[in-house]
């Protein structure tokens, strides 16, 4: 029985992807593995930690086979980035043989199919901006909808103001994009890139997508886009605003939530954030502080004197980010006026 188990564990092809990842992380050591974890989600970290805990004795042969497969996959990815799948297959066939090349490309296939615009995601945002700003707004909208919100937000904020609203509107109205369209845009942006083999429509864009992007933009960009959309498409603007949270919306928080937020905020940051807001917003904050704390905050606001609008908006953005984070964690509730927010 033990002999059979030993024979099976030497066969890399019998291992799952998670088991291979666990063996790889153990093989490269804790110092490098901890750096890898920084790029993983909490769920992925927990899953891999569980797999590592389940590992028994790892033979040298098994470890070497896993490391070799990882090396081959990394080599294939590098070739694909340089010249596409055909180029990668040609080089792999020359160095590893036809069958091995086919196996490696097949292993990478599913990942390539599910990640359009991979080469754009790896690029520096400033380079992407230079790369796409002359493109049609619909093309820009398609590309931004596939990027992570932080990178997309930087690019959207950096576009000419007359283009920002157009692009944001197109992202919000985007529903499903044909793989043929995605492939065509990819061909224009990169001469050789792995084409999508799936004929299913890929979801990208939509109101939630544009809200996430705008939420990460600076206040000036956020305000400009919303005000412009209110003129061009009031219904869409209203739908977006319902899903957004801006600093002035702090009045929508119940007292318990505001008190929870205040525990996390630096006093000087809060003083700056309140400098230019309406009295009702300030009063909502003061109401949820002790008299002494409220008095100290008012003194801090007066002591600050004239403050650059940019600094005020940065402080407001930090607090908004904290509020959104606490809402995601379920620690506070933001009432947006929907039926789901009604207390019973």
UniProtKB/Swiss-Prot annotation:
Which of UniProt's keywords are assigned here?
Answer: Bacterial flagellum, Cell inner membrane, Cell membrane, Chemotaxis, Flagellar rotation, Membrane
Q: Where is this chain's protein located in or outside the cell?
A: Cell inner membrane; Bacterial flagellum basal body
Q: Which family does it belong to?
A: Belongs to the FliG family.
Give the motif span (Part of the EHPQR-motif). 135-138
MF-aspect GO terms: cytoskeletal motor activity
GO CC annotation: bacterial-type flagellum basal body; plasma membrane
Q: Write the gene name.
A: fliG
Site note Part of the EHPQR-motif applies to 170
GO biological process, alphabetically ordered: bacterial-type flagellum-dependent cell motility; chemotaxis
Taxonomy of the source species = Bacteria, Pseudomonadati, Spirochaetota, Spirochaetia, Spirochaetales
PANTHER family listed in its UniProt record: FLAGELLAR MOTOR SWITCH PROTEIN FLIG
Which protein, by its recorded name, is this?
A: Flagellar motor switch protein FliG
> Is DNA damage found in the keyword set?
no
Q: How does it sit in the membrane?
A: Peripheral membrane protein
* Job description of the protein: FliG is one of three proteins (FliG, FliN, FliM) that forms the rotor-mounted switch complex (C ring), located at the base of the basal body. This complex interacts with the CheY and CheZ chemotaxis proteins, in addition to contacting components of the motor that determine the direction of flagellar rotation.
* Pfam families documented for this protein: FliG_C, FliG_M, FliG_N
Q: Mainly localized where?
A: membrane
């Amino acid at each position: 029985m033990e002999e059979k188990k030993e024979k099976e564990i030497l066969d890399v092809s019998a291992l799952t992807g998670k088991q291979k990842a666990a063996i790889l992380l153990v093989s490269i050591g804790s110092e490098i593995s901890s750096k890898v974890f920084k790029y993983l989600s909490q769920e992925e970290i927990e899953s891999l930690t569980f797999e590592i805990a389940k590992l028994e004795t790892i033979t040298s042969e098994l470890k070497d086979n896993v490391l070799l497969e990882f090396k081959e996959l990394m080599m294939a990815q590098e070739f694909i980035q340089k010249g596409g799948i055909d180029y990668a297959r040609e080089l792999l066939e020359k160095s590893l043989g036809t069958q091995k090349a086919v196996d490696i490309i097949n292993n990478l296939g599913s990942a390539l199919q599910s990640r359009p615009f991979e080469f754009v995601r790896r690029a520096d945002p400033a380079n992407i901006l230079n790369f796409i700003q002359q493109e049609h707004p619909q093309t820009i909208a398609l590309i931004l909808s596939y990027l992570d919100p932080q990178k997309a937000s930087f690019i959207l904020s950096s576009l000419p103001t007359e283009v920002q609203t157009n692009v944001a509107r197109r992202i919000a109205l985007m529903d499903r994009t044909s793989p043929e369209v995605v492939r065509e845009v990819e061909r224009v942006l990169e001469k050789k890139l792995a084409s999508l083999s799936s004929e299913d429509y890929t979801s990208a864009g939509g109101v939630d997508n544009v809200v996430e992007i705008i939420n990460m933009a600076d206040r000036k960009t956020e305000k400009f886009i919303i005000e412009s959309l209110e003129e061009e498409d009031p219904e869409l603007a209203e739908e977006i605003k319902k899903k957004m949270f801006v600093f002035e919306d702090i009045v929508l928080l119940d007292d318990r939530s505001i008190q929870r937020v205040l525990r996390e905020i630096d006093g000087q940051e809060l003083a700056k954030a309140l400098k230019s807001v309406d009295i009702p917003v300030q009063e909502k904050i003061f109401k949820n502080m002790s008299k002494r704390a409220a008095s100290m905050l008012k003194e801090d606001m007066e002591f600050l004197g004239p403050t650059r609008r940019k600094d005020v908006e940065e402080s407001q953005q930090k607090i908004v980010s904290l509020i959104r984070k606490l809402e995601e964690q379920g620690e506070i509730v933001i009432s947006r006026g929907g039926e789901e927010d009604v207390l019973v």
